[in-house]
């Protein structure tokens, strides 16, 4: 079967690398999604182990759909009864892009009607109870080609289960993990985040250092599916836990807000990595480190939601000045949507990478080799 992992734009290559490390076959990249060939066992492995992907979708079929009749017949032809039991709940959601069928609510209604008719005929029911487990149907219609999926994840994979509550504008865990991955941090050198907020970046760094799978402390929609043996999930969890490392790590998170620091400590405890991270109330404008090597990965306020633009610019200037004394072998990654970040920071980036934080277009400014 084909499995599809949607992701934030700009993270496709990182997700593809993750899938290859899990020995998935025929990994293929498109804008905003990565495909592979897989099995039911791979559904469990991907959900438990992926750090940067948004969710895991099982592809059911693809066909041309230039009008509602073609959409109905294409959906009706799919073997829904092979996946959805007679009492299964099957809500529908999706999107359309550059297609004749552009009304998403109308397409949702057609997909629901066609799948319900097929299931009703197969089970001999005029009305389907939908009282059982949830089988979320997703569709995409791109350039008049419809693709139908079942969502195996349920809640997005960014919901690791450790964030008790948010401070201000939180960074999604999947994006935080991507930033840490881009820094090439592996747990050997010091790791710092001077704008740690609720602790997401240091926590994801600790999970990466320990090689702890991010999905071990949560549940997934497909765990309740009748065609997914619970043994597959236990085996995937055992495989992931067998890969964990146990060592000493120098991971630090600082924030000027004491309430944020306390929340970060609480979240780290929920994630089981509080023994790996030091959190402190600290001013990023006074950041200093003497160690020869290290990684600094951070997401300062952008001036769009948390601070006014001028305040953000002054913050970047102060922070940039503090980092001028950082030893030259440190690697620094800063996520920002500010178009004048480099000017304010006082240094041009050695490398930049475009990606999105939610709906905000950002750059990752990368310094160091």
Q: Residue spans of the language-model regions?
A:
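SAM-dependent Rossmann-like transferase core, predominantly class I methyltransferases
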Residues: 148-184
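Conserved S-adenosyl-L-methionine
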Residues: 171-289, 305, 309-313
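Short SAM/SAH-binding signature in class I
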Residues: 293-299
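Long protein-protein interaction modules used by eukaryotic assembly/scaffold proteins
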Residues: 333-334, 367-369
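Accessory substrate-recognition/RNA-binding modules or partner subunits associated with SAM-dependent
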Residues: 2-135, 152-154, 158, 165, ...
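Short amphipathic alpha-helix with an adjacent loop that forms part of the alpha/beta core around
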Residues: 81-83, 286-292
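C-terminal edge-of-domain segments
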Residues: 137-153, 365
